[in-house]
């Protein structure tokens, strides 16, 4: 295949990472992004790697699978991780970022790379004669989605994804909330709105009876469990809320708390957490409260949360349809297409779920697109690593039951020898082996 550059289509998390990895290997890149020419309902700017759901990249500890994945990506020179570290905001033991600052930094690093040419245009055909990484994400334009759908033998998959509302911090009644991280882990990074049992029951009733924005009549409601609308959780029952986004454990009242409580209990019946959304600390999002309620209903119901009675919503929660491929049948472990070998796919459309996972898939696809360009052997990352196990899972899962997957220790190859019973010790050992195997892999 004679060519002088590689195409990358889509400048989200996966596409930005793929383009950067290719360019860092000395290969010119044409990075296509349709925003600027054609917008989507969910994106607010034309910047690359815009975060449309949460601003959290989740846990940072190596005993957390996504923490291990992030460490592997750091060692591989990830532009997404570098930008995230530079724009992080307080979030306890998690890595959360200033939403706008993060996407702006990624845009600057990628667009200003001397080997990357940014083309603001919509691509409607799958290239056949140029090595191309397709990372158009869950919001792929209809024209291109149709071509990918055909590659998929017409058998597309989808689920619904939702985002949480964002609030102006100056409109929160600080006398009714308190600053604390669960179990006092890390710095006190979350505002906590405690509820008594009666307050929770009233809130739950209002939530389950609130009016949702309509879906297309021909589409079934299918949700990814990790980003399920709060009203759907509420309809599953009270315990789903109390063991999910509103769980109170580890969030005891502070000694100086004077608000309402149930008797002498030291822990609230339920807690709503708010997490800082930008570096200035002027915006907070409601953690786990992704929603598809009508906007008027969001205001009515969420203003029942203590401290949010007069809250101003700078962005209401929204929901969008995510499409993904039959990766077990369509992709190699390198994210290369089995049916059209000049194509690589990356991001949520491949069935990886989550910001970090999307960027990781872009990193692997970019590395392998560059290796194909240079006529080098493909790089299949070890299944003992988080990055390798994720690539292996989405390309080897049972196609009939394939659903999007977050990185987790369950998909990473088991340790050899006797099973370590202590979970933390076992995860530490898996992480230690993963990083050692990654270093060895990179030296070969």
Curated annotation (Swiss-Prot):
What GO biological process terms does the UniProt entry carry, in alphabetical order? tRNA methylation; tRNA wobble uridine modification
Annotated Gene Ontology cellular components are: cytosol
**Quick one: which residues bind FAD?**
10-15
Q: Which Gene3D superfamilies match?
A: FAD/NAD(P)-binding domain
The superkingdom listed in its UniProt entry is: Bacteria
SUPFAM superfamilies from the UniProt entry:
FAD/NAD(P)-binding domain
Q: Which UniProt keywords apply?
A: Cytoplasm, FAD, Flavoprotein, Methyltransferase, NAD, NADP, Transferase, tRNA processing
In which family does this protein belong, per the annotation?
Answer: Belongs to the MnmG family. TrmFO subfamily.
UniProt xrefs under NCBIfam families = gid_trmFO (TIGR00137), PRK05335.1 (NF003739)
What does the function comment of this entry state? Catalyzes the folate-dependent formation of 5-methyl-uridine at position 54 (M-5-U54) in all tRNAs.
Name of this protein: Methylenetetrahydrofolate--tRNA-(uracil-5-)-methyltransferase TrmFO
List the source organism: Streptococcus pneumoniae serotype 4 (strain ATCC BAA-334 / TIGR4)
What taxonomic classification does the UniProt entry list for its organism?
Bacteria, Bacillati, Bacillota, Bacilli, Lactobacillales
């Amino acid at each position: 295949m004679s060519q002088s550059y590689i195409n990358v289509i889509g400048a989200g998390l996966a596409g930005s990472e793929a383009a950067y990895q290719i360019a860092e290997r000395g290969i010119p890149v044409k990075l296509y992004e349709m925003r600027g020419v054609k917008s989507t309902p969910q994106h607010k700017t034309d910047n690359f790697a815009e975060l449309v759901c949460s601003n959290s990249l989740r846990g940072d500890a190596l005993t957390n699978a996504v923490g291990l994945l992030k460490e592997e990506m750091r060692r591989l020179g990830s532009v997404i991780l570098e930008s995230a570290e530079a724009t992080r905001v307080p979030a306890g033991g998690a890595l959360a970022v200033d939403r706008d600052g993060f996407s702006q930094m990624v845009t600057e690093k990628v667009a200003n790379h001397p080997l990357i040419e940014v083309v603001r245009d919509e691509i409607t055909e799958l290239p056949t004669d140029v090595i191309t990484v397709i990372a158009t994400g869950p919001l792929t334009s209809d024209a291109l989605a149709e071509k990918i759908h055909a590659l998929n033998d017409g058998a597309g998959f989808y689920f619904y994804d939702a985002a949480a509302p964002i609030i102006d911090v100056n409109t929160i009644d600080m006398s009714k909330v308190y600053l604390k991280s669960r179990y006092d882990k890390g710095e006190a990074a979350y505002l906590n709105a405690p509820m008594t049992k009666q307050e929770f029951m009233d809130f739950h009733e209002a939530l389950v009876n609130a009016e949702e924005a309509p879906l297309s009549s021909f589409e079934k409601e299918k949700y990814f469990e990790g980003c399920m609308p709060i009203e759907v959780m509420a309809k599953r029952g009270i315990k789903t809320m109390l063991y999910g986004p509103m769980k109170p454990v580890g969030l005891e009242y502070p000694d100086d708390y004077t608000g309402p409580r149930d008797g002498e209990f030291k822990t609230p019946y339920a807690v709503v957490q708010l997490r800082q959304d930008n570096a200035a600390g002027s915006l907070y999002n409601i953690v786990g409260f992704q929603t598809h309620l009508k906007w008027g209903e969001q205001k009515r119901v969420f203003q029942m949360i203590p401290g949010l009675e007069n809250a101003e919503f700078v962005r209401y929660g929204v929901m969008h349809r995510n499409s993904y491929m039959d990766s077990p049948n369509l992709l190699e472990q390198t994210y290369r297409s089995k049916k059209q070998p000049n194509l690589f796919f990356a991001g949520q459309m491949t069935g990886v779920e989550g910001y970090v996972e999307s960027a990781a898939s872009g990193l692997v696809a970019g590395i392998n697109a560059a290796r194909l360009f240079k006529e080098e052997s493909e790089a299949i990352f070890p299944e003992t690593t988080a990055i390798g196990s994720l690539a292996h899972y989405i390309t080897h899962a049972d196609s009939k039951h394939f659903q999007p997957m977050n990185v987790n220790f369950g998909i990473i190859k088991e340790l050899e020898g006797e099973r370590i019973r202590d979970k933390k010790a076992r995860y530490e050992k898996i992480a230690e082996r993963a990083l050692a195997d990654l270093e060895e892999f990179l030296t070969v």
